[in-house]
Amino acid sequence: MKPKFIVIEGLEGAGKSTAIALCQSFLNSKKIDFINVREPGGTPLAESLRTLVKAQHDEEIAFETELLIMYAARSQLMHNVINPALEQGQWVLADRHDLSSQAYQGGGRGISANTLASLSSMVLKGLKPDLTIYLDIDPVIGLERAKGRGELDRIEQEAIEFFQRTRMRYLELANDDNSIKTVDANQSIEHVHRDITNVLRTFFAEQK
């Protein structure tokens, strides 16, 4: 079986960390050799960019600046970690990927699809996740969960309307792409785990 690229996506408080732990357990049960990455981040430079883009600053950060920082971090991760791992036969399990930029910067910030497509093409060079599990949650519920974890970062402090637009774009993109599987994260954790496991089982059954 060729190495696969699996991504977990969702708004703040959707339960991505728990979902990733479940995926790790599933992959281990299948004796799959895989690595974990997160976006933005995953390399020393990309982690510095993560800190930079999430922090509060004394000046306003332009939407385009935020977008370019995200893609700069993604470029480092692709070049230094993801592409080499896949080439060496390892699977990749990612906490966020390009879909986050399409949803947050495209839907939330209103940056044009053409701009996003241009950056995506330059950085990804055609590489696309084999499976994306999108954890769909009501932004109000998700942000309440996120607040329970501690202080919110710069992006997490955006108005609820920002997250509503982001969610709408996530749902639109998931509806148009068969490789994106939507899981209702408003359910109990037991039901969410069941649905994620079913997605993974179906995905594996379809592989050769």
Curated annotation (Swiss-Prot):
Keywords, sorted A to Z: ATP-binding, Kinase, Nucleotide biosynthesis, Nucleotide-binding, Transferase
Broad enzyme group: transferase
Catalysed reaction equations from the record: dTMP + ATP = dTDP + ADP
Pfam families: Thymidylate_kin (PF02223)
InterPro entries: P-loop_NTPase, Thymidylate_kin-like_dom, Thymidylate_kinase
PANTHER family: THYMIDYLATE KINASE, UMP-CMP KINASE 2, MITOCHONDRIAL
Entry-linked HAMAP family: Thymidylate_kinase
Function (record text): Phosphorylation of dTMP to form dTDP in both de novo and salvage pathways of dTTP synthesis.
Family the UniProt entry places it in: Belongs to the thymidylate kinase family.
Record's protein name: Thymidylate kinase
Organism in which the protein naturally occurs: Pseudoalteromonas translucida (strain TAC 125)
